[in-house]
Design a protein with these regions (language model features):
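Protein kinase-like catalytic domain
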Residues: 49, 59, 110-113, 151
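A cross-kingdom marker for long, charged
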Residues: 122-159
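Inter-heme linker and motif-flanking segments adjacent to c-type heme-binding CXXCH motifs
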Residues: 1-5, 38-40, 64-68, 113-115, ...
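The canonical Cys-X-X-Cys-His
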Residues: 45, 52-62, 143, 147
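Stable alpha-helical elements in mature extracytoplasmic
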Residues: 41-44, 54, 101, 105, ...
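Electrostatic cytochrome c docking/interface patches
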Residues: 20-50
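Electron-transfer interface patches adjacent to heme c in soluble/periplasmic c-type cytochromes
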Residues: 72-115, 128-140
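Extended, well-folded interaction surfaces typified by the phenylalanyl-tRNA synthetase beta subunit core
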Residues: 2-22
Length: 159
C-alpha cells in the first residue's frame, strides 16, 4: 500500500489563482463525443485511454504551460512523471511497441508482462497492477483496439 503524498508544487505553480488563466488558454471543457467513423469498441477504448486511464498524461509530450501536445498524441514523452522517457505507443516504425500484436498489447496492459517475458517497471507497473488489471475483458479489448489504431507518429525524444 502506498501512502498519498502531500501536494508539493513549487511557487508559482502552487498558486491556485493561476488555474483560471491556464484553463482559459489550455482547457477544453465538454463531454466525450463518439466518432461516427469508428467502431463502438474503438470509441470505448478512446474514452478509457483519454478520460479514465489518462494514458495521454504520460505518453504524450507537453508544450507551453504544461498542456499536452495534441499534435504528438501518444508519441512518447521525454520528461515523464518520474523524470525519465515514457515510450511512444503509436504503431510508428521507431516506436517501442511497433512489432506487437493486439494480443501482446492486451497481455501487457492486463499483467505488465512484455512479449520478451520481462515486466513493466516504474509508474507503468503501478498502472497495470492497480488499474488496468481490473478492466473487464470487453474494456481491455476496446482499449487495445484504440491503441492499435493510433496514428503512427515518430517518437518524441527531445526535451
Amino acid at each position: 500500500e502506498q501512502k498519498n503524498l502531500e501536494h508539493d508544487l513549487a511557487v508559482p505553480f502552487s498558486w491556485r489563482w493561476l488555474n483560471g488563466p491556464w484553463k482559459l488558454m489550455f482547457f477544453e471543457p465538454g463531454v466525450y463525443s463518439p466518432r461516427q467513423d469508428k467502431s463502438e469498441a474503438w470509441n470505448r477504448g478512446a474514452y478509457i485511454a483519454t478520460a479514465l486511464a489518462h494514458c495521454t498524461e504520460c505518453h504524450s509530450p507537453r508544450g507551453l504551460g504544461g498542456a499536452t501536445d495534441t499534435g504528438r498524441f501518444m508519441a512518447g514523452n521525454p520528461v515523464g512523471p518520474d523524470g525519465g522517457y515514457v515510450p511512444n505507443i503509436t504503431p510508428h516504425p521507431d516506436a517501442w511497441m511497433r512489432d506487437w500484436e493486439k494480443a501482446d498489447i492486451a497481455v501487457y496492459l492486463e499483467t505488465g508482462e512484455l512479449p520478451d517475458s520481462d515486466y513493466a517497471g516504474g509508474a507503468m507497473a503501478e498502472v497495470s497492477d492497480n488499474g488496468l488489471a481490473f478492466l473487464t475483458q470487453s474494456d481491455l479489448v476496446a482499449l487495445v483496439e484504440f491503441i492499435a489504431a493510433l496514428k503512427p507518429l515518430p517518437s518524441t525524444r527531445d526535451r
